[in-house]
Amino acid sequence: MELDQIRKQINAVDDAMHRYFTDRLRCSEDVAEAKLQTQDSVYKPEREKQVYARFPGDADEEKLYRLYVRKVMQLSRYHQYGIFLGKGNVDTEFETQYRSVQAAINERDTTDASVKIELTPDPQAEQGMSIQDMLSVLGDFGTEVTVLQYEGSKVSVTVRVSGTDALESQRRLFYMLYKESVTYNMCVV
């Protein structure tokens, strides 16, 4: 088979995956609405373990598919956090920290600011994201990490933010990190 033909097949598979992903996001929206009604949390590690268990095996195909499913679930949670934020369902502690950072950026003469997030990831991913997941999600959304420090079990991540519009575009991501960390603090440095 010629490379062009193979690429056409790949494009067809990608198109089908896009349709399924869109369907998955719609389901995620329904899940978010149900969780809002029951005041449940977005991140449910036990549910994610159930999903992974559906795809056992050590063959390369199964391992790669579990990674794919893991990323899809991470993106679904990110989508759900956006729905929670859009409905005003935000933890007061996060909102206080976020508004403080927003005000500090507004007070500066420059639009370029560094935001430091100190957090404790969940090393066992029992109640939150691991450090690997956190770094992955920061990279996935184009967050410019300028400093990364470890101190015991805590991680300090400094990111560059170009004004309050850029900060607002990262709000959902920061909220996801807040909700899926053992501890969390955000400030301008």
Residue ranges and their predicted role:
Residues 1-189:
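Domain-level signature for soluble enzymes in the chorismate/prephenate branch of the shikimate pathway
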